[in-house]
Amino acid sequence: MSEDRQGRSGDSNKILYCSFCGKSQHEVRKLIAGPSVFICDECVELCNDIIREELEEKAQSARSSLPKPREILEVLDQYVIGQLRAKRTLAVAVYNHYKRIESRSKNDEVELAKSNILLVGPTGSGKTLLAETLARLLNVPFTIADATTLTEAGYVGEDVENIIQKLLQKCDYDVEKAQQGIVYIDEIDKISRKSENPSITRDVSGEGVQQALLKLIEGTVASVPPQGGRKHPQQEFLQVDTKNILFICGGAFAGLDKVIQARSNDAGGIGFGAKVKSSERKQEVGKILAEVEPEDLIKFGLIPEFVGRLPVVATLEELDEPALIKILTEPKNAITKQFKKLFEMESVELEFRPDALSAIAKKALKRKTGARGLRTIVESVLLDTMYELPSQENVSKVVVDESVIEHKSEPYLIYQAQPAPAKAASGD
């Protein structure tokens, strides 16, 4: 019956009907034939409306789920101690970046430029942790690349497009997800060119890498081999558009403060009108770095085009002893909290005395490792205890004080009081 009603496309005498709304070919403007089915122009339009509404709802949902700068800062505060200026800069930059992605789908007349980020700060000041926390908060794919391993295409080393392959691996080769991810490129200062003047010889791990990264950071379609594959001519590649990927580059930039000071001194002039620089300013490296200008980065060894692709610059200060003590105890995933949890699994309480925390912070400062060195110090002083503890009985508490850190003495072990053995009843 239904076959008679729909008709066959090859039978010109039969009246054809839409398989969805049931209208005949005479009641609609156009009837499109498929394999044993028909759809009219009205149903096609209705389907388009349904899809459009769903896309708008999805975009609305994405807008509502995008945290505001203040909310981003609040989350960063839970994991990263200090560095308020850098955190505020990052919060605004990341919020604007994902708003820009939304605006591209609306076909606005004004096209918003991409704003990648450069983090400048000493080792262990929190650059990588900031980038990781942002990616976790926004629930986007995230990968870390080491700039020192990168070389120009055709040379021994990692091709810059390997960065995108790593990002794809993080999201199971979902290209759409990867295209809205975050890439953190560490040690970016190590690829500065060796001199201010362009070199005649090839600098495959310096200026050459900067040139190779330019297009990737600005926005290009990168060809990446599929899962488990290696590049060869006969292979089909995955095409990944990098224009919406947020690139965060970080580096210690040792010596940049001297470049900034030299510029400031030149600007001061000489003679009666010269500005007198205080001796205190020489000590405040963090404050000097906060005055960084694009020309300073170019003088340091980044090429002008590369500096232009990183318009947002956030500087981080060197962490002092009070900040390191806070890092040990306050963040959600603080090092002391992690070790306390490990000992708790053995039904043992772990206590760090205030003098121990201060000694750990001083040791990290002496080693110039910043927050990154804190875990190494705690690991080393607790290693023997963590080795012996599972085999020991009746230990209720482990105490770490200054002597454990400074003199490498053993932590104090406090044992549970053993119940006195019951007296045997005397037989009369």
From Swiss-Prot:
GO terms for cellular component: HslUV protease complex. CDD domains: RecA-like_ClpX (cd19497). InterPro entries: AAA+_ATPase, ATP-dep_Clp_protease_ClpX, ATPase_AAA_core, Clp_ATPase_C, Clp_protease_ATP-bd_su_ClpX, ClpX_bact, P-loop_NTPase, Znf_CppX_C4. GO terms for biological process: cell division; proteolysis involved in protein catabolic process. One of its GO terms (molecular function) is protein dimerization activity. Keywords: ATP-binding, Chaperone, Metal-binding, Nucleotide-binding, Zinc. Pfam families: AAA_2 (PF07724), ClpB_D2-small (PF10431), zf-C4_ClpX (PF06689). Zn(2+) binds at residues 18, 21, 40, 43. ATP binds at residues 122-129. Residues 6-59 form the ClpX-type ZB domain. The keyword Flavoprotein does not apply. SMART domains: AAA, ClpB_D2-small, zf-C4_ClpX. ATP-dependent specificity component of the Clp protease. It directs the protease to specific substrates. Can perform chaperone functions in the absence of ClpP. HAMAP family: ClpX (MF_00175). Belongs to the ClpX chaperone family. Component of the ClpX-ClpP complex. Forms a hexameric ring that, in the presence of ATP, binds to fourteen ClpP subunits assembled into a disk-like structure with a central cavity, resembling the structure of eukaryotic proteasomes. This is ATP-dependent Clp protease ATP-binding subunit ClpX. It comes from Xanthomonas campestris pv. campestris (strain ATCC 33913 / DSM 3586 / NCPPB 528 / LMG 568 / P 25). The lineage of its organism: Bacteria, Pseudomonadati, Pseudomonadota, Gammaproteobacteria, Lysobacterales.
